[in-house]
A protein has these predicted regions:
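Non-catalytic, conserved peripheral segments adjacent to functional cores
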Residues: 42-158, 174-176, 183-242
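Intrinsically disordered, low-complexity segments enriched in serine/threonine/proline/glycine
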Residues: 28-29, 38
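Short, Lys/Arg-enriched N-terminal segments with co-localized hydrophobic residues
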Residues: 35, 39-43
């Protein structure tokens, strides 16, 4: 009986070791920013989803990102960033500065960009909900002057990646929201640029998400210029051209 138990234990350990080796080696290729295997969530802590205009045209470089959240009776755990997973998805940016802001309902921050020091941003809501928007300002892009918006929700833990060459802004939908940014370049106040939050040429439909909320803007954000389709803004790689 003792020998049988020993044999069973050895067999179980061997099977367990073999399974662990197979799991380590079973790495699936990235296709269109996502793993091609339906079991991807076991191996990767994030899913990456491309973004499209309302008429179905892909806005290259924008990604909605959903971390895998592990929850139980104690609470939850998640990875908010992994260089390994992001690099495998083709997002090989380097972040150099983290920012955080807190705003009340109806606050609209934007639409912002930096000129000579453009910033890529990985953004998420730590508390509350915001409607987050990116406008493509890359001259030569097939979506130049187009926008994409997504609701970022602290309960969902979803994220949004915006590369260099975009204007960015958000509107707070809940009583309060705490917002976090990871940036690929440092803040340079001398390089601040912006667009009108309600520019008719861009046509961001804030009301579809926020209803009749009257946005609260800073004096600076009230004075941003209108979008000019003849302005080069950034090149296709997100570098300032003016």
């Amino acid at each position: 009986m003792v020998n049988l138990k020993i044999a069973f234990a050895i067999c179980f350990k061997s099977l367990q070791a073999a399974y662990q080796v197979s799991c380590r080696n079973l790495r699936f290729p990235i296709e269109h920013g996502q793993r091609s295997c339906p079991s991807q969530e076991f191996f990767m802590s994030f899913t990456f989803e491309k973004c499209f205009t309302s008429d179905g045209v892909e806005i290259e470089g924008l990604y909605q990102i959903q971390p895998k959240v592990f929850g139980d009776a104690r609470g939850y755990f998640l990875e908010t960033y992994s260089e390994k997973d992001f690099f495998e998805a083709g997002l090989k940016m380097k972040f150099v500065q983290d920012n955080q802001s807190k705003s009340s309902k109806g606050v609209l921050r934007g639409l912002h960009f930096q000129t000579l020091h453009p910033q890529g941003k990985l953004v998420r809501s730590l508390q509350g909900k915001v409607y987050d928007v990116a406008v493509d300002l890359r001259k030569g892009s097939k979506t130049f002057g187009k926008y994409f918006g997504v609701v970022l929700d602290s309960e969902k833990q979803n994220q949004f990646y915006i590369p260099e060459g975009f204007a960015h802004g958000f509107l707070v939908l809940t009583e309060e929201a705490t917002f976090a940014y990871k940036c690929t370049d440092f803040y340079h106040p001398e390089d601040e640029g912006g667009l009108m939050w309600n520019d008719p040429a861009i046509g961001i439909d804030w009301n579809s998400v926020a209803g009749d909320v009257e946005p609260l803007l800073s004096e600076k954000d009230k004075k941003h210029a209108a979008f000019d389709s003849n302005n080069n803004y950034f090149d296709i790689n997100g570098k300032w051209t003016n």
